[in-house]
UniProtKB/Swiss-Prot annotation:
The keyword Iron does not apply. GO terms for biological process: nervous system development; neuromuscular junction development; noradrenergic neuron development; positive regulation of DNA-binding transcription factor activity; positive regulation of neuron differentiation; protein monoubiquitination; regulation of transcription regulatory region DNA binding; spinal cord motor neuron differentiation. A zinc finger (C4H2-type) spans 189-206. It is linked to Wieacker-Wolf syndrome: A severe X-linked recessive neurodevelopmental disorder affecting the central and peripheral nervous systems. It is characterized by onset of muscle weakness in utero (fetal akinesia). Affected boys are born with severe contractures, known as arthrogryposis, and have delayed motor development, facial and bulbar weakness, characteristic dysmorphic facial features, and skeletal abnormalities, such as hip dislocation, scoliosis, and pes equinovarus. Those that survive infancy show intellectual disability. Carrier females may have mild features of the disorder. Plays a role in interneurons differentiation. Involved in neuronal development and in neuromuscular junction formation. It comes from Homo sapiens (Human). GO terms for cellular component: cytoplasm; neuronal cell body; nucleus; postsynaptic membrane; protein-containing complex. Keywords: Cell membrane, Coiled coil, Cytoplasm, Developmental protein, Differentiation, Disease variant, Intellectual disability, Membrane, Metal-binding, Nucleus, Postsynaptic cell membrane, Synapse, Zinc, Zinc-finger. Changing residue 213 to W: In WRWF; increased cytoplasmic subcellular localization; partial loss of function; rescues partially interneurons differentiation when expressed in a zebrafish heterologous system. This is Zinc finger C4H2 domain-containing protein.
Amino acid sequence: MADEQEIMCKLESIKEIRNKTLQMEKIKARLKAEFEALESEERHLKEYKQEMDLLLQEKMAHVEELRLIHADINVMENTIKQSENDLNKLLESTRRLHDEYKPLKEHVDALRMTLGLQRLPDLCEEEEKLSLDYFEKQKAEWQTEPQEPPIPESLAAAAAAAQQLQVARKQDTRQTATFRQQPPPMKACLSCHQQIHRNAPICPLCKAKSRSRNPKKPKRKQDE
């Protein structure tokens, strides 16, 4: 009787070992699948970060182009102001010469009339460009400044976004790896090829339906 009881205990132990072993194998298989999914997601995250870096570099390149353009505009504005100052000085000098020439010509014309000679032609009669009115007209054209066109909203927004991303990136590098805030996972829209959130059902730019690059696997039923 004792032997039978011992045999039954051993059989129960063997059954329990078998059930626990099967349960362990199932958990091991699930664990292996989870690790594979983890490694795959890490690779995708690395790709997303690389793509984000490329986009950031592209935006910063546009910001640098805008900075250089504004620097050139400032240099040209200073050059134009200097040229206008030089033109104003020349105009004042021309006006003084006109003022000196006019009474002298009137005196010469009066002397010529006493001798029965015709008066000399005026400067404007000889050449239009020697007229004081011509120089005044030119001055008005010189002082007309070209209107600077406004920066397109999309380009201005891109420049502002690039600067914000650069500041956020510098702040992020000062944090430890444990508490580092990760950017949201992104993917390329199949229609417009713009970067959108990985889980976005519809592209916010072109309104096309989005399909996830890595669709979620259906959950397995928990083992009883």
